[in-house]
């Protein structure tokens, strides 16, 4: 049964270009998530899983766009192939179907493990770079949401009993950020 070719794209940040991932690839529909790959509860991934039918092919730029770790990758590939859906990874040049051979399963495990390893290396280099930049005084972290004066006012008003949700709205910060300011004194 010949089905549709459906694309799945995931970008981690809003400044990444989702079109780049499936350029020069023919697909009839594309599902795009702007979310971290560590979370498998992504709205467009869920929509894709509901949309695909037996005979369809899901096209993904690379394994790390579908999942960040090997367990999630294997689970998603298995969920799709058990329903008669093929999955094609362009960067790795691999296609998985429901009739996968032991060699195909090995390739999925090896390539998925490499993607996971690559992600771990990137994070390690990022942490090392931040540490070195901090030592040089070049890295200050993210800009604070509130000035010191605003933070002091926020703490005073919260201590006086004003509703925290109201304060968060008024200071244009999330409640989590508000609680972080209340936990610290700097």
Swiss-Prot record:
A GO BP entry: DNA integration
DNA-binding region: 164-183
Active site residues according to the UniProt entry: 12 (o-(5'-phospho-dna)-serine intermediate)
Stated name of the protein: Transposon Tn501 resolvase
Function: Resolvase catalyzes the resolution (a site-specific recombination) of the cointegrated replicon to yield the final transposition products.
Keywords from the UniProt entry: DNA integration, DNA recombination, DNA-binding, Plasmid, Transposable element
Residue intervals of the Resolvase/invertase-type recombinase catalytic domain: 4-137
Kinase recorded as keyword: no
Alphabetical list of Pfam families matching this protein: HTH_7 (PF02796), Resolvase (PF00239)
Disordered, as annotated region: 17-38
């Amino acid at each position: 049964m010949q089905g549709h070719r459906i694309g799945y794209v995931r970008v981690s940040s809003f400044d990444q270009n989702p079109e780049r991932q499936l350029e020069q690839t023919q697909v009839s529909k594309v599902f795009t998530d702007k979310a971290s790959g560590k979370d498998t509860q992504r709205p467009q991934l869920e929509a894709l899983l509901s949309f695909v039918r037996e005979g369809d092919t899901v096209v993904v730029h690379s394994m790390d766009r579908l999942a960040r770790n090997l367990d999630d990758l294997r689970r998603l590939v298995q969920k799709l192939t058990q329903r008669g859906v093929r999955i094609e990874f362009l960067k790795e040049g691999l296609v998985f179907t429901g009739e996968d051979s032991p060699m195909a399963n090995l390739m999925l495990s090896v390539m998925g493990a490499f993607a996971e390893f690559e992600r771990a290396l990137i994070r390690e280099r990022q942490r090392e770079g931040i540490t070195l930049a901090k030592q040089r005084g070049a890295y200050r972290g993210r800009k604070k949401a509130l000035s010191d004066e605003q933070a002091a006012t926020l703490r005073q008003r919260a201590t006086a009993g004003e509703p925290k949700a109201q304060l968060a709205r008024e200071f244009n910060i999330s409640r989590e950020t508000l609680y972080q300011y209340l936990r610290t004194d700097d």
